[in-house]
């Protein structure tokens, strides 16, 4: 799973709106984001809400024309419907577990 970061104003504003699809195995991360909409979308999404880099909620199969938010989140990952599991696996792979007695990595 390739996680692409929406880190410019333009990519955050446009996101995936208007695209016919998102290539399988790719997802878009929106840092500092607690609410998203799927207006202008042409396909359903899985939303993986993150708090401190860890999944706090997953909304599966969010169809176009919807609004979702998660107060517990500080970021969200948008992926093709059905790919939330791959996103979570990639997040775990990218963040090794803390050693006993250490705090998890930020």
Task: Give residue ranges: language-model regions.
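Compact, glycine-rich, soluble single-domain proteins
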Residues: 1-106
């Amino acid at each position: 799973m390739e996680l692409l970061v929406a880190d410019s104003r333009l990519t955050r504003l446009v996101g995936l709106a208007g695209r016919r699809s998102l290539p399988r195995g790719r997802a878009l991360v929106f840092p500092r984001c607690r609410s998203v909409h799927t207006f202008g979308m042409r396909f359903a999404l899985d939303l993986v809400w993150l708090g401190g880099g860890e999944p706090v909620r997953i909304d599966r199969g969010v169809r176009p024309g919807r609004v979702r938010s998660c107060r517990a989140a500080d970021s969200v990952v948008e992926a093709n419907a059905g790919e939330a599991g791959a996103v979570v696996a990639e997040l775990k792979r990218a963040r090794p577990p803390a050693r006993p007695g250490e705090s998890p990595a930020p």
